[in-house]
Amino acid sequence: MTKNLLVELGLEEIPAYIVTPAMHQLRDRMATFLTDNRLAFDSIDVFSTPRRLAVRVRGLADQQTDLTEDFKGPAKKIALDADGNFTKAAEGFVRGKGLTTADIEFREIKGEEYVYVTKHEAGQPAKTVLAGIPEVLKAMTFPVSMNWASNKFAYIRPVHTLTVLLDDEALDMDFLDITSGRISRGHRFLGNETEIASADSYEADLRAQFVITDPAERQNMIVEQIKAIEDKHNVTVEIDEDLLNEVLNLVEYPTAFMGSFDTKYLEVPEEVLVTSMKNHQRYFVVRDKAGKLLPNFISVRNGNDQYLDNVIKGNEKVLVARLEDGEFFWREDQKLKIADLVERLKVVTFHEKIGSLYEHMERTKVIAEKLADLAGLSAGEKADVARAADIYKFDLLTGMVGEFDELQGIMGEKYALLAGEKPAVAAAIREHYLPNSAEGELPESKVGAVLALADKFDTLLSFFSVGLIPSGSNDPYALRRATQGIVRILEAFGWEIPLDQLIAELYSLNFASLTYDNQPAVMDFIRARVEKMMDKTIPKDIREAVLASSTFVVRLQLAASSAIFQKAKEADYKEAVENLSRVFNLAEKAEVTAIDEALFENDQEKALAAAVAGLELTEDMAGNLDKLFALSPVIAAFFDNTMVMVDDATVKANRLALLKALADKASAVAVFNLLNSK
């Protein structure tokens, strides 16, 4: 016979970003607890609001399954003394299992007898096991926790209720400073405390108290209400998924409504208005059918539609205060001169160990000019890169960015255009922040891409130089994101810039403000980001072989990893890799590089030398791999008919040099002896 179990934890309001992860954590911990304790169940439903986390376990067994375990102990010769009595070793072993020496039997394993005991444990009633639920709740972890009252324990928020029901039976247990029961709390303003009749009536009992416990249902309510507003007013609402997920975790009973603001604020840049509404007020943006921003917004109330007019007015008043700030900064910032703001960056700290933002910009300009050459930019584009690098951080000292830091770069572009800067320069100021996430938008212009690369390179090299290197999951300066941005930009623009050569050249620079250091660590860090870009289905040996190649060009390494992965599916892969691996293994022993054809002793040696001399690899990695695999029979014939490690030192050195010549060429694709040919 099975039952349904409900566990609800009632708390003060949880931060919206924690609600969903905490709900899933509770589900996972409950599933682990039940499984570890041999309580079978069918499924687990999850519920959450800002003031509660809950799970309902369906089809929970009424008793643990029985457990029978065999335990191996010491060898018989250790378990028995000379008189055949059990030793202390045997007695201690069985005592540790809760058994006696009467339970011992001997079993032979590979010719020697060992002590064995069998322990039978009858399953306990479910209610006995469920007394451990408080420990499940205590084990929950959160990004932030707090203490309250005079309690010594900490939790995400103060706990008010714990509801534990097995079907319709309330189970008593203590958690922190409360005792469980069947009481739950309704909506903070519209509902009351209520008794949950049974695990199955949970949603209905709280719905009567204006609480929608299912987050998916709340989300559907919000979306449907917004669509109704769209239809009524003939508008389009931007339903941003991240904002929607946040809003549904701010309310227990959602009611969407539309508010408005004065059209005069539409003179402020759209990005300012959208940031004010979306990021600061959690409002949805409203546009007309053509996509033009309207002086309206959609918000979601935590409650029903009573007194909604007052709620709308209150939300409008709060938004207007934000828009007033935006309008003021927009007006005042235009009075500032870019040159003056750049000069002031000399006293703005980039990092106390690295120097000022102005010094960061100076280094970035030098790097940008080198990158512009390597990327083949035109003279006009190079001039735009240089100008953008001179000023690109100026907007950090504007009032608008000081108030709305999300707009850095965006406002820089707008103010630069107003000041008469070229559109390409202004766009680069905005684009240098891109990408701002793992899958974020990339720069569109070459000028912006070069500036973005240069800024990220200096950031990476500077922090590594002063020992501020990410470790584990700790990356306070977002260096992984910056490096991922470097890799993505290089791949997207197809710039075949050898990163090892570039980094070496950058490390040769001597800046007055900072000397770069720690080159090997930087290279390994970049390689790790390139590996992240490779297809996740590509085996580790292929990734490592390609990353060790002599071609540290992002696009080519990504292409090589894909080409080898596809080649691995072909019948001749194993043999070809084995032959090339043998070449690489022996090539490591080479001490000279000159090849003397007069020392060749057989046709197979001459054939391999001719093949190596004629081998020309290009940027087509799949084609290169075909050429190398086509050499497999030639390599095999060479090894079948030629002893490399002969006594004659001159001949041996010549043959090793030949193999090294082939390995050097092939290493542009991969280091083949790192591949698994099994």
UniProtKB/Swiss-Prot annotation:
It catalyses: tRNA(Gly) + glycine + ATP = glycyl-tRNA(Gly) + AMP + diphosphate. One of its GO terms (molecular function) is arginine-tRNA ligase activity. GO terms for cellular component: cytosol. It is found in: Cytoplasm. The keyword Kinase does not apply. Its EC number is 6.1.1.14. It is an enzyme of class 6 (ligase). InterPro entries: DALR_anticod-bd, Gly-tRNA-synth_bsu, Gly-tRNA-synth_heterodimer. Pfam families: DALR_1 (PF05746), tRNA_synt_2f (PF02092). Transmembrane segments: none annotated. GO terms for biological process: arginyl-tRNA aminoacylation; glycyl-tRNA aminoacylation. Keywords: Aminoacyl-tRNA synthetase, ATP-binding, Cytoplasm, Ligase, Nucleotide-binding, Protein biosynthesis. PANTHER family: GLYCINE--TRNA LIGASE, CHLOROPLASTIC_MITOCHONDRIAL 2 (PTHR30075:SF2), GLYCYL-TRNA SYNTHETASE (PTHR30075). NCBIfam families: glyS. Belongs to the class-II aminoacyl-tRNA synthetase family. Tetramer of two alpha and two beta subunits. This is Glycine--tRNA ligase beta subunit. It comes from Streptococcus suis (strain 05ZYH33). The gene is glyS.
